[in-house]
């Protein structure tokens, strides 16, 4: 549906009530406005009973941050809209799931809140039926293929699986029962054609918690037997050669929205803590989900917190990345050029509810940020091992910076999971750590301070683990991970090269050779040695360049050398 059609449809459904959503200039999130009293933030949402977790979340129901209150502060129920499995998942899907996975990890690992998550797999849908016909296979075979494909993609991205996946086709009896109860409660009706519709007018001002320029009527334009244009299908009569299930209203299949309401209620009952999905699902999908659940449970607040991720779009294109617009990059295509860690850092650099631009520049920033962190960790570990000789360290200052970082990161997480602020706090700590890791040629007589750097490394690695990022061998694709034997070979190679390099530079040897000779004679002797051994020094440089081709980065630190194994995708 194009923009003009959406506007016309919206005016037909809600005359005089709505303005188009604007973009918040501060954070890039959508702002909704409405003349409908119930659609305003005031009066439609009440803080749930329970204990305040100390976390603020942006609740799309109120369009502002609210305290996260849970009946049990150690457990949260979470329903996530899942994939419609008719094709490969793309990068827009990946960003949404990675962002919510980050929030889930923060709740669990920072605040100690266990998550019970259910995710629906829509395995019967108009798109699935259409694609199956094009490929001349059954809708079931198509759906199972792409369901498995989706799960493989999520595993590759290190997205934690939900507590339970629920397929729509395995929940048909529950869906039929759910619809029957809504009819019995006076909020739905069946027609002579075998369709069942939700009666939007029956719930009055309870409808309209989310408002957008999208309209569900166009997708159901062929369904002409409903009472009001705003009514939406709960059950659709089957068409020739389409899959169907027997029901009290005849052969048919469920509507889109009823699937999620039924499955979420079957797992969590009449109360839900957290509901998540992309911003495009807020209206009509989540709007209709709420209407159905509250009509079924006869309640006024079924879900307490609705969180939505912003769209991903390509540079220079304001439209969201989507299959229908054919402007997408599949997850598998992305992983040919970048690692899961790169995507996770890309997502961390923006707020989860903000729109985000995918471009060469934004990915370059993510890659460089990871490399900066990895380099600091390697340097700090080299200092711990005594391989990096530095000037005296201001230990008290670094302890202070580390403690401040811990406070700032937790404060950022408590403030609607503000990952950009948390990453910036860690990068600031690294900046101060790097300022004092300056190599010198001779070791000072002052005592070393390895403990504070050990604590910094431990905290940074813990932070990355919470974010789902794994430096070191897990950042490198499995087929390229070095074995213990290869590790030892490289270690010996770098050690041998370091000895040859020190011999080539002739610093210690020339001083020993000249004994008490005059300063000028010392310089002349060393110059001669450097000229004689220059081919060896060049060979050392060439060896380092050749090792870099295979992802082995050798760092010369005074009279010692260290090495690290890099993900070669960082060079793309």
Curated annotation (Swiss-Prot):
Places the protein is found: Mitochondrion
Taxonomy, superkingdom: Eukaryota
Short sequence motif 'KIIK' region: positions: 127-130
Alphabetized Gene3D superfamilies for the sequence: Cysteine-tRNA ligase, C-terminal anti-codon recognition domain, HUPs
Catalytic activity reported: tRNA(Cys) + L-cysteine + ATP = L-cysteinyl-tRNA(Cys) + AMP + diphosphate; 2 L-cysteine = S-sulfanyl-L-cysteine + L-alanine; S-sulfanyl-L-cysteine + L-cysteine = S-disulfanyl-L-cysteine + L-alanine; S-sulfanyl-L-cysteine + tRNA(Cys) + ATP = (S)-sulfanyl-L-cysteinyl-tRNA(Cys) + AMP + diphosphate
Chain positions recorded as L-cysteine binding sites: 82, 122, 285
Keywords for this protein: Aminoacyl-tRNA synthetase, ATP-binding, Ligase, Metal-binding, Mitochondrion, Nucleotide-binding, Protein biosynthesis, Transit peptide, Zinc
Cofactor(s) of this protein: Zn(2+)
Record text on cofactor binding: Binds 1 zinc ion per subunit.
Top class in the EC scheme: ligase
Major place of residence: mitochondrion
EC number: 6.1.1.16
Motif range ('HIGH' region): 83-93
UniProt motif 'KMSKS' region: location: 320-324
Binding residues annotated for Zn(2+), in chain numbering: 81, 260, 285, 289
Keyword Mitochondrion in annotation: yes
InterPro entries: Cys-tRNA-ligase, Cys-tRNA/MSH_ligase, Rossmann-like_a/b/a_fold, tRNA-synt_1_cat_dom, tRNAsynth_Ia_anticodon-bd
Binding site for ATP: 323
Gene Ontology annotations for the cellular component aspect, listed alphabetically: cytoplasm; mitochondrion
GO terms under biological process: cysteinyl-tRNA aminoacylation
Alphabetical list of Pfam families matching this protein: tRNA-synt_1e
GO molecular function: ATP binding; cysteine-tRNA ligase activity; metal ion binding
Domain notes: 'KIIK' region and 'KMSKS' region are required for cysteine persulfide synthase activity.
Protein family membership: Belongs to the class-I aminoacyl-tRNA synthetase family.
Free-text function comment from the UniProt entry: Mitochondrial cysteine-specific aminoacyl-tRNA synthetase that catalyzes the ATP-dependent ligation of cysteine to tRNA(Cys). In addition to its role as an aminoacyl-tRNA synthetase, has also cysteine persulfide synthase activity. Produces reactive persulfide species such as cysteine persulfide (CysSSH) from substrate cysteine and mediate direct incorporation of CysSSH into proteins during translations, resulting in protein persulfides and polysulfides. CysSSHs behave as potent antioxidants and cellular protectants.
Protein name: Probable cysteine--tRNA ligase, mitochondrial
Organism, scientific name: Xenopus laevis
Lineage per the UniProt record: Eukaryota, Metazoa, Chordata, Craniata, Vertebrata
């Amino acid at each position: 549906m194009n923009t003009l059609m959406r506007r016309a449809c919206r005016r037909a459904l809600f005359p005089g009530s709505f303005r188009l959503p604007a973009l918040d200039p501060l954070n890039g999130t959508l702002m909704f406005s409405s003349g409908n009293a119930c659609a305003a933030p005031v009066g439609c949402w009440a803080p749930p009973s329970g204990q305040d977790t100390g976390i603020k979340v942006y609740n799309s129901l109120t369009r502002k941050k609210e305290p996260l209150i849970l009946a049990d502060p150690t457990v949260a129920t979470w329903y996530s809209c899942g994939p419609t499995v008719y094709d490969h998942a793309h990068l827009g899907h990946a960003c949404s799931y990675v962002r919510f996975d980050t929030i889930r990890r923060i709740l669990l690992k920072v605040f100690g809140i266990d998550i019970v998550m259910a995710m629906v797999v829509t395995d019967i849908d108009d798109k699935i039926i259409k694609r199956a016909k094009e490929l001349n296979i059954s809708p079931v075979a198509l759906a199972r293929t792409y369901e498995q494909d989706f799960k493989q993609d999520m595993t590759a991205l290190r997205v934690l699986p939900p507590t339970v996946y629920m397929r729509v086709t395995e929940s048909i009896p529950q869906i039929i029962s759910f619809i029957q109860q809504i009819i019995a409660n006076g909020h739905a009706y069946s027609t002579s054609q075998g369709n069942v519709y939700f009666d939007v007018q029956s719930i009055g001002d309870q409808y309209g918690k989310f408002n957008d320029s999208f309209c569900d009527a166009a997708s159901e334009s062929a369904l002409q037997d409903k009472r009001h244009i705003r009514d939406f299908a709960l059950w659709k009569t089957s068409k020739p050669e389409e899959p169907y299930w027997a029901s009290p209203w005849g052969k048919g299949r469920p509507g889109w929205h009823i699937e999620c309401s039924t499955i979420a209620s079957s797992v969590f009952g009449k109360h839900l803590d957290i509901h998540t999905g992309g911003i495009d699902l807020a209206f009509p999908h989540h709007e209709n989900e709420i209407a159905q659940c509250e009509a079924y449970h006869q309640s006024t607040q079924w879900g307490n917190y609705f969180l939505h991720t912003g769209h991903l779009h390509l540079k220079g294109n304001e439209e969201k990345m989507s299959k229908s617009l054919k402007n997408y990059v599949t997850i598998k295509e992305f992983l040919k050029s970048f690692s899961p860690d790169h995507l996770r850092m890309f997502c961390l650099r923006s707020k989860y509810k903000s729109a985000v631009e995918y471009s060469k520049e934004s990915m370059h920033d993510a890659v460089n940020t990871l490399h900066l962190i990895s380099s600091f960790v390697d340097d700090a570990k080299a200092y711990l091992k005594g391989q990096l000789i530095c000037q005296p360290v201001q230990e008290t200052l670094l302890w202070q910076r580390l403690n401040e970082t811990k406070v700032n990161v937790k404060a950022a997480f408590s403030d609607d999971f503000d990952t950009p602020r948390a990453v910036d706090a860690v990068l600031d700590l690294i900046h101060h750590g790097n300022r004092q890791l300056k190599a010198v040629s001779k070791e000072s007589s002052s005592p070393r301070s390895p403990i504070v750097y050990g604590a910094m490394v431990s905290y940074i690695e813990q932070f990355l683990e919470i974010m789902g990022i794994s430096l070191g061998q897990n950042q490198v694709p499995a087929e390229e991970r070095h074995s213990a034997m290869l590790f030892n070979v490289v270690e010996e190679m770098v050690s041998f090269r370091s000895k040859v390099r020190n011999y080539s530079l002739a610093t210690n040897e020339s001083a020993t050779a000249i004994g008490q000779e005059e300063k000028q004679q010392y310089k002349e002797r060393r110059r001669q040695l450097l000229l004689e051994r220059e081919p060896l020094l060049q060979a050392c440089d060439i060896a380092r360049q050749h090792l870099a081709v295979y992802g082995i980065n050798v760092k010369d630190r005074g009279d010692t050398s260290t090495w690290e194994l890099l993900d070669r995708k960082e060079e793309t």
